Amino acid sequence: MKFKAPAFLIALALTAPLALSAQADGPALPAAATADQATTSKLVYGLLSDSRYAYRPRALDEATSKDVFKRYLETLDGGKQFFTQADVAKFAPFEAGIATAIRGGELEPAFQVFSVYKQRVGQRVGYARNLLKREPDFSTDERFEYDRKDVPWAANDAELDELWRKSVKNDWLRLKLAGKKPDEIRTTLDKRYATLEKSVNELKGEDVFQFFLNAYTSAVD
């Protein structure tokens, strides 16, 4: 009997050499996939859609494309803290064309979505750090919702502002209850938020490619 590998093993085998190369070169984030990444995308699709290789081959139909798109957004913004409904609506053409993108290795839309994500992270972090200039108002009882997986995307920037205001207030309160002084809290949170932005800014093209390909392989596995 011929062995049929799970989707994630096939993808890992094909992308590992690319990851090692990216670590060695450390390129800046590109606007599109490299030629090698495009080829890998086509190879992974060919293997995962062929019953000779995949344990459970699955076609890239409309339902699967929607699942890939959903998983990719969850990878980037699982807490729905950065994208707005307007952002997600603008990504609709990408969702509709995911099958074509993967089959043809034309992954520019995935990089475009990430570019928007990177911008939104910068905006949100800037807003959060600005809030630290003043101690939150603890005279009102408010609830911060940790698990936001099933909530809708924020309707607009104003909703995100409110979400982040509560998030910063919650972060501040936790440190305050731990006995930290206002200046200590401000310094700690400022570093925390700056580190978040820095970690996103340091992501490379290979990381974006892996995020998207993982969304695909997990959707069909």
Features from the language model and the residues they span:
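Flexible, low-complexity junctional segments that flank or bridge functional domains
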Residues: 2-10, 19-221
